[in-house]
Amino acid sequence: MAECDGKCDTCPSKNTCPDTKKLLAQQDAKIRENMSKIKHKIVILSGKGGVGKSTVTVNLAAALNLMGKKVGVLDADIHGPNIPKMLGVENTQPMAGPAGIFPIVTKDGIKTMSIGYLLPDDKTPVIWRGPKVSGAIRQFLSDVVWGELDYLLIDTPPGTGDEQLTIMQSIPDIDGAIIVTTPEEVSVLDVKKSIMMAKMLNIPIIGIIENMSGFVCPYCNKVVDIFGRGGGEKAAKELGVEFLGRIPLDIKAREASDKGIPMVLLDCKASEEFKKIVKRIVEKVEGKKE
């Protein structure tokens, strides 16, 4: 047997090595301890890229924060970490101590952790294979000192791969998954895959959000359905899950997002819809446990 180099995640013998099993059990115990301080854990999923899932995650967090909830956002998209930019806290490094890694806190009090905070700059790619990505996610879950939170939102990459599987199998008592889609038929096909994955892993479906549902004209305020309309609601009915609502495209919202300002802080149609959706989510999640 080759000499151990301590790199368990990429070791070909990790599934049979007693040392690895012991370390994973210890890490699982730390994850359970950390997650026990968080009332509600929600995974944000999308079947394909480009549907605005990270934008939805950030604005759900900001809307929950406006309701007085203590909120954290874990950016589990290791290869495409956009949360730091969207929350306006890029170019920031987390502090670490004996207790673990302390999350970055926005000026509004939202706690956040992302691989983006650990890279030298936003141009540096993360060129990792699946096992190392899964190991990084588990380390975030075990080592980040979230403290007591009302909600932890986990922003995942698109698809149904290693990252989603690692999160859903590592976090105990996940309240559910929110699926983000756009109105086109091609996006809706992928929604079904995300929902099937969650159901196979016994993760409840909180509901579907249809993003980019209509464009708000900046001149007349009329909503134009440039990507179609109703695909998310149709998928929800077909699959027997709740349709949470539609978020329109809005130039004001896009400009704010580029500056690291969540659109829920603006006076616009998208902000109104986000607040309605978050109210439905809170009623469903908290009502379920009470």
Curated annotation (Swiss-Prot):
Q: What cellular-component terms does GO give this entry?
A: cytosol
What is the superkingdom listed in this entry's lineage? Answer: Archaea
InterPro entries, sorted:
Mrp-like_CS, Mrp/NBP35_ATP-bd, P-loop_NTPase, YlxH/NBP35
Q: Which UniProt keywords apply?
A: ATP-binding, Hydrolase, Iron, Iron-sulfur, Metal-binding, Nucleotide-binding
Q: GO biological process annotations for this chain's record?
A: iron-sulfur cluster assembly
Binding-site positions, ATP: G47, K48, G49, G50, V51, G52, K53, S54
User: What molecular function does GO assign, one term?
Assistant: metal ion binding
Give the family this protein belongs to, as stated in its UniProt record: Belongs to the Mrp/NBP35 ATP-binding proteins family.
Q: How does it assemble?
A: Homodimer.
Q: What does this protein do?
A: Binds and transfers iron-sulfur (Fe-S) clusters to target apoproteins. Can hydrolyze ATP.
Spell out the PANTHER family in the cross-references: CYTOSOLIC FE-S CLUSTER ASSEMBLY FACTOR NUBP2 (PTHR23264:SF19), NUCLEOTIDE-BINDING PROTEIN NBP35 YEAST -RELATED (PTHR23264)
Return the protein name: Iron-sulfur cluster carrier protein
What's the source species for this entry?
Methanocaldococcus jannaschii (strain ATCC 43067 / DSM 2661 / JAL-1 / JCM 10045 / NBRC 100440) (Methanococcus jannaschii)
